Regions:
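Composition-driven recognition of glycine/serine/threonine/acidic- and proline-rich low-complexity segments
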Residues: 1-162
Length: 162
């Protein structure tokens, strides 16, 4: 496992280059963009895969005003897994309408936030490469104002976007 702690979203290209050097891999442009993308992952994957996507909830548990969930983002036409994600969602920091939509489990948090026009900032905290299972990943915090609304880990296997 090769891990790079990201100090700032503005220096992430240097961090990606460090990851390539330490792990002896060469990422293609799509993989680099996946690691640094600070927009909605689901929309970005739709463009990369040239396919509409849907969210598959593997597990979703709500306890003490926190939702933990595991999801896959898959292509609607082929059912191909594009990304696997684990998230912790802090409901106390979200409006009721957004909480209700998250509980339904039909859309990713990024799409829900986009549709509800909630101002957020994605702070990428770590990127890495798992050499045993051959996937790149990133960790980030989703913030609204000074409040953390979610912590997310997204995994992208090499064949997910090809």
């Amino acid at each position: 496992m090769f891990i790079i702690n990201v100090k700032s979203n503005s220096t992430i290209l240097n961090d990606i280059l460090k990851l390539e050097k330490r792990s002896s891999i060469k990422l293609n442009s799509f993989e680099k963009i996946l690691l640094m993308n600070n927009g909605t992952t689901e929309l970005f994957l739709q463009i990369l895969s040239n396919s509409l996507t849907k969210l598959v909830i593997i597990q979703q548990i709500e306890k003490n005003n926190i939702i933990t969930r595991k999801i896959n983002i898959i292509t609607k036409d082929r059912g191909k897994i594009l990304a696997e994600a684990q998230s912790i969602i802090y409901l106390k920091n979200l409006p009721n309408k957004i909480k209700d939509e998250i509980r339904k489990g039909e859309k990713g948090i990024g799409m829900i936030i986009l549709e509800n026009k909630l101002e957020t900032y994605k702070r990428i905290t770590e990127i890495g490469y798992n050499s045993k299972e051959s996937y790149i990943y990133r960790k980030y915090k989703l913030l609204s104002g000074k409040h953390i609304i979610s912590k997310v880990i997204e995994n992208f296997k090499g064949d997910m976007i090809k």
